[in-house]
Amino acid sequence: MTFRGFFVAGTDTGVGKTEIGRAICARMALRGLHPLALKPVETGCEPDRPEDALALREACGSSQPLDELCPYRFRLPAAPLVAAEAEGRRVDLLRIEGLVQRAKAPILVEAAGGLMVPLAREPLSIDQVDPADGPPSAVIVTNLDLAERLQLPVVLVGRAGLGTLNHCALSVEALEQRDLLLAAVVLNRTQPDDDPTVASNARWVAEMTGARVLGPGPFVADARQRLLALGELVARLVG
């Protein structure tokens, strides 16, 4: 089976999805896979400077045009649907699906936030609507829906410390309900702390979910050394 890439999602905001995504991209590049990156939506950014998307592109070593790397960029730091509607715009999932389908190399798709974050509104098809309820309305589409459409192995990034057991278990359950392939849960340390739960959380997440769990590694302050350390952490995903 051809290796197509990964769909990276978080269990929460601020868990370090982009860090893990960069590490995976860099590892794929090291293997000579010439990876591509796709951040479908980035919010809280200037339209010409989506920082997370550009960081992914740099790790890939690619020269993707900005509109293929990050087709939707919004200034408001909010969920994609909220940010889009604040600007009177909409996110077209068919455009995103097309970018993945046309990719000629493994692609890493980084979601904006967690699995249930709202991305867009789509009209209900006629067979989804009860005529007694009146004309068709719209349904909210989430990152989980996008993951289901793309059918890429999912890398779920969670915080290393307190609170991660519940977040990871709920996210894994959501993936299982859609029969989506979970490549791994990656527990990431985003700051130095003395949280006593860090040492055992990986074992508990594995026991509770049955998922493959990577990490957490030690926190590394230096950005370059941190990328190298995370690259070693995710090496088993790529080889």
Spans of model-derived segments:
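Inter-motif core of Ras-like GTPase G domains
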Residues: 123, 137-160
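Short, structured coil segments at secondary-structure junctions
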Residues: 60, 150, 208-210
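Phosphate-binding/switch loop-helix module in NTP-utilizing enzymes
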Residues: 80-136
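Short internal beta-strands
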Residues: 39, 155-158, 183-189
